């Protein structure tokens, strides 16, 4: 792995200030408090702290999350964690609002998300457009109200042996507020410097005890209205009937309009000294309006008598998310601790297209359609058992084992007939977002069974180690085993070495196996629309293009870290890692051309320009380093906190499976994985990210200043001459909070200096209309100014 000198220099700076991930405008907790936090992620030992962990782990407090200018959990995490990337793509259908996050440059579905240590269900949305996470169906982090969260634990290490499928890059464990009494109420407003994107927020939480203090209940809710932003520009290409008029601003490019509500409820009740019942639930609704590509007056996708000036379709998505976990835990007279639980998760997205038409229906076509729905359901039953044994070592040895049954369902429901109807060679379906036809819809399910065991011991006061193993059997593709070994050695109280070796896997999601639909795609450098259909890998059409049945991804990861605490006020960790992923599941390139169209028509599919499918065609290697730490300077009547973090990560495609013979036969000359897709995997995210923050805290005031440097990233269009690298950018955030009695007033600015990413080259800008790349890690909205008032009791 080659780390450029600039990255090394940045690492040195990070080492002087570095921090265990506090949010950018936060007033962080003291170093001692952070290090002494007992963790519940990555270990089954009951009293393991951050400082003692054998794996790198970050703790982001509730105060840190709420101190940023955003009501979105994923955005707040991205500002706190140098290894997390959460871009803001536009014109990408549902992905514009249900955005995926990636850890250490890997795919968003290679991160496992837990809530209170229980697996969170994924979104039903499959990301199909040219964004980070193309082909992934990830967890929607923004369905959980920030007001409900006590802290977030982020394990930056492979953990499939402990938690099962998906935990290749790491684990995000969201710990909800519990027995805390009292509560808070918060209202906020923000706006971008361009005068758009108004954001209205109202949130609160409260906790009470009941049953003579044997039980407690904590409730939280959040309401948010986000107005859209628009950074599109006028058409600057050659005059054409199939394009907007020269100078016409026909598109809307930016954040969608979102109306969101989220709530949570957590409770526990102690039935006896040995048995406690618990439950927690979350619910979220979102009404999302985004925009598709403009249809010009003379386009084959328009009827001139209906829209003489052309039209801009609107995609309206209604997202509903529900979860419930209920369980009982306790201990036996023999010293065994046990936990039995049921876990239900549900996500549904209904799609509508408005301000549109279906050309195949002629001038009498409706202008709005119901396009169908995607739906996912998760049901899990599990049992965890553990006990500490006194085997004559420095501390008891923790032995744990358990079993889990998981049932997953994924449904694709059809839309109304007009949303998908297609006649002859005419453009079919609702323009902007074509509906799901009954022929591509269906209901699918699978079962899996898992057994796990692990052992963790402190052999001496200085040396601890652990072993974990897990076996899972899936009804659709077979079984998979994974293992993990970890260790930590403390040379002194101030310096320790830690490391892990882990194998892992990720099962292909049901959406990746069965989703199929047609979408309109505009390829870089080509102003004409392409109707591209996604086919299941085991369909006749996909097999004609050389597809094979999907199998699980497998991974092998290594990490080696140094933990330093030279003083009580300074804490520093440096962790290097390598993650090899074999048979990585990716969405193939868009296979287009006359030969493709001929092949599709031979299969009875008309009006389609091309196809694509999921494939295990790629092996990747990701290498990098994380540096995090913190320093607190205690003054007479105040304190100064300095925090920082740095991540350098590079991904290399080590192998691309041989191109199927079918893509070179019958006059075809196509690549299953082309340079655009390979470039997105290797260079579509910042090579490095550095954040540094400072805050001054007194009895009444908190003043915070933070800066994040996002490294360079690149895009590779079909023509190499149009390759573009986007330069590194600094984004500065600042806030001031005044506290009096129970009230806190905050004024702040994210992206204070109104920084924008480098602009697209003209060839990549759709004739000047798309000034910025969807890959930008901090979006392209400019400065955001906000105010917030909070009352606590």
Region spans (language model):
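C-terminal beta-signal and adjacent terminal beta-strands/loops
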Residues: 123, 650-651, 706-716, 737-793
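N-terminal Sec signal peptide and the immediately downstream disordered periplasmic leader
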Residues: 1-78, 141-144, 203-208, 268-273, ...
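Transmembrane beta-barrel wall of Gram-negative outer-membrane proteins
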Residues: 181-184, 194-309, 313-332, 739
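Extracytoplasmic beta-strand/coil segments of soluble accessory domains associated
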Residues: 77-124
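Gram-negative outer-membrane beta-barrel transporters
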Residues: 401, 571, 576-717, 788-792
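N-terminal periplasmic accessory domains that precede
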Residues: 73-76, 80, 101, 114, ...
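Short acidic/polar hinge/loop motifs at secondary-structure boundaries
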Residues: 118-156
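Outer-membrane beta-barrel transmembrane domain signature of Gram-negative proteins
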Residues: 305, 311-324, 333, 344, ...
């Amino acid at each position: 792995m080659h780390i450029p000198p600039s990255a090394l220099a940045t690492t040195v700076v990070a080492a002087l200030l570095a921090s265990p991930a506090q949010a950018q405008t936060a007033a962080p907790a003291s170093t001692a408090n952070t290090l002494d936090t007992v963790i519940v992620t990555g270990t089954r030992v009951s009293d393991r702290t951050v400082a003692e962990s054998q794996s790198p782990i970050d703790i982001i407090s509730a105060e840190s999350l709420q101190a940023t200018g955003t009501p979105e959990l994923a955005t707040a995490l991205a500002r706190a964690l140098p290894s997390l990337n959460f871009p803001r793509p536009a014109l990408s259908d549902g992905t514009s609002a249900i955005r995926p996050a990636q850890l250490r440059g890997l795919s968003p579905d290679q991160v496992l998300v837990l809530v209170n240590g229980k697996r969170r269900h994924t979104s039903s949305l499959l990301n199909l457009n040219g964004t980070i996470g193309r082909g992934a169906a990830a967890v929607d982090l923004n369905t959980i109200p920030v007001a409900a969260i006590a802290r977030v634990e982020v394990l930056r290490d492979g953990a499939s042996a402990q938690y099962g499928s998906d935990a290749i890059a790491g684990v995000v464990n969201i710990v909800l507020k519990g027995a805390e009494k009292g509560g808070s109420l918060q209202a906020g407003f923000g706006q971008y410097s361009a005068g758009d994107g108004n954001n209205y927020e109202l949130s609160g939480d409260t906790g009470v005890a009941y049953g003579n203090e044997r039980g407690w209940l904590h409730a939280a809710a959040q309401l948010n209205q986000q107005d859209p932003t628009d950074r599109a520009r006028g058409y600057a290409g050659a005059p054409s009937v199939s394009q907007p008029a020269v100078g016409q601003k026909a598109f809307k490019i930016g954040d969608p309009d979102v109306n969101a509500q989220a709530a949570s409820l957590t409770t526990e009740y102690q039935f006896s000294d040995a048995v406690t019942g618990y439950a927690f639930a979350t619910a979220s609704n979102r009404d999302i309006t985004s925009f598709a590509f403009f249809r010009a007056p003379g386009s084959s996708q328009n009827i001139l008598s209906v829209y003489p000036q052309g039209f801009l379709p609107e995609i309206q998505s209604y997202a509903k998310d529900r979860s419930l976990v209920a369980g009982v835990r306790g201990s036996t007279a023999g010293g065994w601790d046990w936990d039995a639980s049921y876990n239900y998760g549900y996500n549904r997205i209904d799609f509508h297209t408005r301000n549109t038409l279906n050309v195949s229906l002629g001038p009498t076509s409706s202008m709005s359609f119901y396009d169908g729905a995607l739906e996912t359901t998760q049901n899990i039953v599990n049992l965890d058992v553990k006990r500490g044994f006194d085997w004559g070592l420095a501390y008891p040895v923790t032995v744990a084992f358990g079993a889990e049954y998981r049932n997953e369902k994924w449904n694709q429901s059809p839309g109304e007939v007009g949303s998908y109807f297609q006649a002859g060679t005419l453009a079919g379906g609702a323009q902007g977002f074509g509906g799901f036809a009954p022929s591509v819809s269906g209901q699918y399910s699978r079962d899996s069974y898992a057994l796990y065991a692990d052992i963790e011991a402190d052999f001496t006061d200085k040396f601890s180690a652990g072993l974990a193993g897990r076996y899972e059997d899936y009804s659709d593709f077979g079984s998979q085993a994974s293992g993990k070994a970890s260790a930590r050695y403390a040379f002194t109280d101030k310096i320790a070495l830690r490391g892990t070796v882990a194998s892992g896997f990720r099962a292909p999601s049901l959406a990746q196996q069965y989703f199929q639909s047609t979408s309109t795609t505009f390829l870089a450098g080509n102003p004409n629309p392409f109707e591209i259909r996604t086919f299941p890998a085991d369909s006749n059409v996909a097999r004609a293009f050389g597809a094979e049945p999907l199998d699980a991804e497998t991974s092998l990861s290594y990490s080696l870290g140094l933990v330093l605490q030279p003083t009580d006020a300074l804490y520093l960790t440096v962790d290097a890692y390598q993650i090899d992923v074999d048979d990585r599941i990716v969405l193939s390139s868009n296979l287009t051309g006359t030969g493709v169209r001929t092949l599709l028509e031979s299969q009875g599919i008309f009006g389609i320009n091309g196809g694509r499918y999921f494939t295990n065609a790629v092996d990747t290697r990701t290498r990098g380093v994380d540096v995090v730490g913190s320093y607190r300077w205690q003054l007479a009547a105040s304190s100064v906190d300095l925090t920082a973090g740095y991540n350098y990560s590079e991904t290399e495609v080590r192998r691309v499976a041989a191109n199927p013979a079918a893509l070179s036969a019958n006059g075809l000359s196509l690549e299953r994985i082309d340079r655009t897709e390979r470039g997105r995997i290797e260079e579509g995210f910042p090579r490095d990210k550095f954040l540094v923050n400072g805050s001054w805290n007194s009895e009444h005031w908190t003043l915070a200043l933070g800066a994040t440097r996002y490294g360079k990233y690149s895009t590779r269009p079909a023509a190499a001459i149009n390759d573009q690298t986007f330069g590194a950018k600094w984004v500065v955030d600042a806030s001031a909070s005044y506290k009096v009695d129970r009230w806190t007033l905050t004024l702040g600015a994210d992206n204070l200096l109104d920084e924008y990413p480098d602009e697209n080259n003209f060839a990549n800008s759709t004739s000047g209309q798309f000034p910025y790349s969807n890959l930008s890690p901090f979006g392209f909205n400019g400065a955001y100014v906000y105010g917030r008032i909070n009352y606590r009791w």
